Amino acid sequence: MKRSKNLRAADAKVDRERNYAPLEAVRLAKETSSTKFDGTVEVAFALGVDPRKADQMVRGTVNLPHGTGKTARVLVFATGDRAAAAEAAGADIVGADELIDEVAKGRLDFDAVVATPDLMGKVGRLGRVLGPRGLMPNPKTGTVTPDVVKAVNDIKGGKIEFRVDKHSNLHFIIGKVSFDETKLVENYAAALEEILRLKPSAAKGRYIKKATLATTMGPGIPLDANRTRNLLVEEDPASV
């Protein structure tokens, strides 16, 4: 009951008739977060693309300048020297054939997966397990690579992966509620820049149709996705 009351009170602080500048949205999100734990701050975009068409798929990665606030558990499929290098770089789980079998049976105690190219023939059969969770290694996201050290370091350092879903929505995290507001906005700016860079040439009309920022269990805050400059400014003087 208390949680419901808190949620209603938080929701009442959000003006649904406007789109907030990123800095304002972050401040409001922090203010309306009511969880006892350090919640995650997430952004959702509704994109003007048709993901059923290969030339309108939006998928990529970005290294958030201030990380995500969470140390990802990384699984690496590798053998020999590359397996040893992955372990030395801080990979949490490393293996090959036996590990592939474990994952096929449902082992999912990890947040990211990296594989060397020579093992992808075997890892490929895990598509039904890893695919729906967005964990399938892919050369385009740097997770199928002989350089497992770089891949592990990138992921541990705050690299996030994003992919438009079948409903044309794209979600990504920008940090924790405890983050300084400037760091959250700078993380958002880095992700936004990369997503804009990846706009498919085949996509027509408005690219980002709707944007929302929210914390774990917090209200969704309408975000002005057209704001691509001066993100650390509350509002454009001309629009006040």
Swiss-Prot record:
GO terms for molecular function: rRNA binding; structural constituent of ribosome; tRNA binding. It comes from the Bacteria. One of its GO terms (biological process) is translation. SUPFAM superfamilies: Ribosomal protein L1 (SSF56808). Keywords: Repressor, Ribonucleoprotein, Ribosomal protein, RNA-binding, rRNA-binding, Translation regulation, tRNA-binding. InterPro entries: Ribosom_uL1_bac-type, Ribosomal_uL1, Ribosomal_uL1-like, Ribosomal_uL1/biogenesis, Ribosomal_uL1_3-a/b-sand, Ribosomal_uL1_CS. GO terms for cellular component: large ribosomal subunit. HAMAP family: Ribosomal_uL1_B. Binds directly to 23S rRNA. The L1 stalk is quite mobile in the ribosome, and is involved in E site tRNA release. Protein L1 is also a translational repressor protein, it controls the translation of the L11 operon by binding to its mRNA. Part of the 50S ribosomal subunit. Belongs to the universal ribosomal protein uL1 family. This is Large ribosomal subunit protein uL1. The gene is rplA.
